[in-house]
């Protein structure tokens, strides 16, 4: 698979790095590790929102060489701290993220998949935390989906499963899997190690801004690696054909 983004000795003050790695088209990459590991800092750097030491190549060009307008066409980014910019109907907010604003059926499909059908006429400042999270997810999906944006290459998500119930998490997994099959590269942070074990193709395990392990999910999420990252003992079990991680006392 082609390399979409390449990081070389990326670092930010004392919070991150230096670390290196590759993001590949058609793969879901999970960033895992304890709080303060540097996951959010790394995602913001990969999104082009911050700068620091080291280099990042995006689609063969230095990330800092991309204009904001061009970057928005090729990558989408959802941070944890996003709040509604000002009051507007949800459908209007979602339309602002579409490069092809005539694709109303696509907007309705994505909204329906994330159970937002009945929220489209509501104002963005009247949403619960979970509803706003789903609106944010719908917005970045509409921004980057190859169905309407052939230039879309990379989707960056900071803890996208926050505030979602089990059904909504499953719906998002289906959307991300479909985007991945269309060739998009997806990088997301996660605190659910078993979710990573089921849904990620590859993982980067971080602690204190350093990369402890990277590679296929099964190679990274091993009890020794996790013990080093979290300071706790883990076991990996096979239950009805599915691998599962549990803490041991």
Curated annotation (Swiss-Prot):
It is a peripheral membrane protein. It comes from the Bacteria. InterPro entries: AAA+_ATPase, ABC_transporter-like_ATP-bd, ABC_transporter-like_CS, ABC_transptr_BtuD, Metal_Ion_Import_ABC, P-loop_NTPase. One of its GO terms (cellular component) is plasma membrane. ATP binds at residues 33-40. It catalyses: an R-cob(III)alamin(out) + ATP + H2O = an R-cob(III)alamin(in) + ADP + phosphate + H(+). SMART domains: AAA (SM00382). It is found in: Cell inner membrane. Its EC number is 7.6.2.8. Keywords: ATP-binding, Cell inner membrane, Cell membrane, Membrane, Nucleotide-binding, Translocase, Transport. It holds the Pfam family ABC_tran. The keyword Plastid does not apply. Part of the ABC transporter complex BtuCDF involved in vitamin B12 import. Responsible for energy coupling to the transport system. The complex is composed of two ATP-binding proteins (BtuD), two transmembrane proteins (BtuC) and a solute-binding protein (BtuF). PANTHER family: METAL TRANSPORT SYSTEM ATP-BINDING PROTEIN TM_0124-RELATED, VITAMIN B12 IMPORT ATP-BINDING PROTEIN BTUD. NCBIfam families: PRK03695.1. This is Vitamin B12 import ATP-binding protein BtuD. It comes from Shigella boydii serotype 4 (strain Sb227).
């Amino acid at each position: 698979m082609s390399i979409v983004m390449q990081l070389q000795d990326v670092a930010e003050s004392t919070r991150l790095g230096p670390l290196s790695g590759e993001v590949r088209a058609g793969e879901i990459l999970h960033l895992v590790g304890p709080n303060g590991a540097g996951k959010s800092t790394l995602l913001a750097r990969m999104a082009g929102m911050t700068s620091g030491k080291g280099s990042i190549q995006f689609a063969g060009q230095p990330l800092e060489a991309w204009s904001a307008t061009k970057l928005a066409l090729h990558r989408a980014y959802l941070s944890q701290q996003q709040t509604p910019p000002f009051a507007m109907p949800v459908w209007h907010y979602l339309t602002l993220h579409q490069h092809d604003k005539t694709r109303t059926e696509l907007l309705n499909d994505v909204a329906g998949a994330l159970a937002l059908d009945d929220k489209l006429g509501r104002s963005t400042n009247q949403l619960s935390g979970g509803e706003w999270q789903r609106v944010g997810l719908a917005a970045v999906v509409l921004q980057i989906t190859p169905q309407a944006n052939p230039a879309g290459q990379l989707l960056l998500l900071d803890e996208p499963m926050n505030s979602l119930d089990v059904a909504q998490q499953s719906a998002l997994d289906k959307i991300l899997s479909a985007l991945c099959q269309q060739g998009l590269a997806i990088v997301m942070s996660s605190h659910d190690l078993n979710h990573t074990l089921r849904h990620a193709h590859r993982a980067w395990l971080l602690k204190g801004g350093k990369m402890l392990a990277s590679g296929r999910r099964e190679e990274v999420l091993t009890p020794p690696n996790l013990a080093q990252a979290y300071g706790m003992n883990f076991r990996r079990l096979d239950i009805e054909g599915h691998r599962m991680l549990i803490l041991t006392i």
